[in-house]
Amino acid sequence: MNAYLSDQPVRLSPLRDEQGNQPRFGLLLEPGRPGMHVGELPAQWLKGLARSHHLLLLRGFAAFADAESLTRYCHDFGEVMLWPFGAVLELVEQEGAEDHIFANNYVPLHWDGMYLETVPEFQVFHCVDAPGDSDGGRTTFSSTPAALQLADSSELELWRRASGRYQRSAAHYSSRSAAPIVERHPRREFPILRFCEPPVEGDASFINPSEFHYDGIAPEQRGELLASLRRCLYHPQAHYAHRWRSDDLVIADNLTLLHGREAFAHRAPRHLRR
């Protein structure tokens, strides 16, 4: 379908994965004329779409020349959080990385701001340079409401009893976080999941993992908890893996989704700004 903004059409269609499957969330926006800039789309309109569809992919638009212009754009969405590294995180592989975020490791599912007092409502990703199709590095998103809908009654009962405690020391912070696995959206009250996924057990190559503890369940139920969460969060109806193209802009509902990253080839030209 088309939406008309300032007499210029924007094409809207459901987001689909590379196999053509349509998850229960996500919307693709494409320009209706050549050279249309992302900044021509009203931020309030995009925020409404993001709250309804949880993940927006803006593809084919002219985008941002630098981090400063991306930051100015993001101010239209609300207050921009200032992290220890500034407003924009440059996600690019670093030689001798001391944290998995800056390596070419996979990154398990998590939510941003989990160690902060205020969790940002939205994330904005801009792809400066995309890796090759065979290089890996897709960003993964999982809808927690969809996962809750996919769970059976015994899984839901287990999730509702469980809570997670996490501790992490990274380049920019060291902190602890605790949250029940099943929680209410902080603004809209519907159920969501708050889950920080551990890395693959026994993976010695994973750089600087967090510490993970789960309360409210018996120790022998930890494996069942993790397996059931992964089953639902990685179900095709709840999960989307995004292969980047240069100048893609992705707006994610950070209060509703979890996100992560697939591993990518060493020195692949993968550069995102978030």
Sequence positions of predicted segments:
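Active-site environment of non-heme Fe oxygenases that use a 2-His-1-carboxylate facial triad
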Residues: 1-37, 51, 92-246, 251-274
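Structural motif
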Residues: 60-62
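Classical protein tyrosine phosphatase
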Residues: 69
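Short Gly/aromatic-enriched secondary-structure transition segments
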Residues: 72-75
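Beta-solenoid repeat scaffold
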Residues: 77-85
